Amino acid sequence: MGPADLQPQLDPTHIAVIRYPAQWLPPASDVSGFFAMVRAEHEVTVVAAEALLEQPEWAATAIEIDRAWRRVTFPGPLPWELVGFLADVATRLAGAQIPFTSMSGFTTDHVLVRAAQADLAVTVLSGESPPDQRPGTNP
C-alpha cells in the first residue's frame, strides 16, 4: 500500500507550526479544526490553523511561529503493521524537491508541506508526474 492508493487529500486550511517554552500550558480557549501538540523537554510545539493565532492568548507567548503550511491527509485506517509508507511518501516528495514534516494520528497519517507547493505535493503523492516531467512538456 502506497500513498497513491489512499487518495491523498489536501486540507484548504493554512497551518502554523508554533514553538512555546517548555513550561507553557495551552490557554483555556476554543480550538477547532486540526490541532496537534507535542511536549518535549525543551519546548512545546503546536500545529494548528493559522487562525488560532488571531487569539492573543495563543500568539503572545509564542517563541517562534512558522506559517504557510498545508496539510495533506492519507485517510485511514492505516494498519499498524504497514511498513515503508512514510518512506514512500518521502521518496516521492524528495523527487519533486518538496520539503515536508509528518505526523500521525491513531488511524490517519498527515504530512505538512509549504502552501506554495501543496498542489504539486498532492499531484506527486497521487502517483502522477509533476507537470514539468510529463511527456510533451517543456522543463
Show the residue positions of the predicted features.
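Regulatory modules associated with amino-acid/nitrogen control
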Residues: M1-R92, A96, L120-P139
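A short glycine-rich beta-strand->turn/loop micro-motif centered on a GG-aromatic cluster
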Residues: Q97-T108
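A generic structural motif
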Residues: E43-A48, T108-R114
